[in-house]
Amino acid sequence: QEATVKPGVEQVLAAMHARGVRMCVASGTETPLIEAALTSHGLMRWFEFAVDCKNPDGKKKPDVYLDALHRFGVQNPVQATVFEDSPVGIATARAAGFATVGIYDEPMAEFWPQITQTADFASRTWQDWLQNVQQTGPAPRK
């Protein structure tokens, strides 16, 4: 299946990069596939690395998020934010201590009400999230 780039993603990545935010991709998809998709769309340049779930439970366990955090040399999840489109990923990341941003994705539409209730901040579009942060700063944690 061909990966598509959501509108506003590159603008958000560029803005975060300009602010010195270090970024990676932590995914349930295997790393070579992640890197190939990001490279084909010119997005890998914004990320320091990609990491996939090694745990058979996937994102039901925080291993992929903690692995990414530790690769940055950071130990405390409070110092990082996880962007997710799945309620399982959001719940797991929050339980591990990460700030969370829920981003709407059409294949996960049925879970949107749950995502908006669970994430620290939820946005239907990447542009809306960026505009909110630029106007008000990061959203407080729930």
List each model region and its residues.
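Short, acidic loop-to-helix structural element flanking the phosphoryl-transfer center
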Residues: 1-25, 31, 35
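Asp-based, Mg2+/Mn2+-dependent phosphohydrolase catalytic module
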Residues: 14, 31, 35-142
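Short secondary-structure boundary micro-motifs
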Residues: 20, 25-26, 40, 106
